[in-house]
């Protein structure tokens, strides 16, 4: 009896570990592991980006959707990209009450169309920031505000910094 209990426990732990690796671990190869942006930092990002009602806000790596909710409450049209299937589902469930105002897209934001965006938020690992700059620079858009959490975009003119948040504008005069 004790031996059966051991094997059941072993398989539960093994399957849970495999699930965690598959849903959380592999995304590090595409940007960053899931580290939620603190509420205080979310509010700082919203204040920095300062969009008007009806403008389009994009969160590249929206995690559990916390920032999507804050943006939608301000009347912004919101798009969140998330590579982790579990977190994409959580973000979708948390933002359902906003209807078509919020879209959660499961997949890599490296292929995202940002041409309609007025503001973008991102929390990446430092060595991906130059790649992010290329992604944004190579897309057609009018004026785009970009807020980065914790990591600066190399060779970009910083507009403003609040706490760990960096505000940039595209196109800029480097």
Language-model-detected regions and their locations in the chain:
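Conserved SAM-binding strand-loop segment of SAM-dependent methyltransferases
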Residues: 98-109
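A short SAM/SAH-binding and catalytic strip from SAM-dependent methyltransferases
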Residues: 118-131
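Conserved class I S-adenosyl-L-methionine
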Residues: 54-63
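C-terminal substrate-binding/active-site "lid" region of AdoMet-derived donor-dependent transferases
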Residues: 128-174
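Conserved SAM-binding loop
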Residues: 91
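Conserved SAM-binding motif I beta-strand of class I
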Residues: 77-82
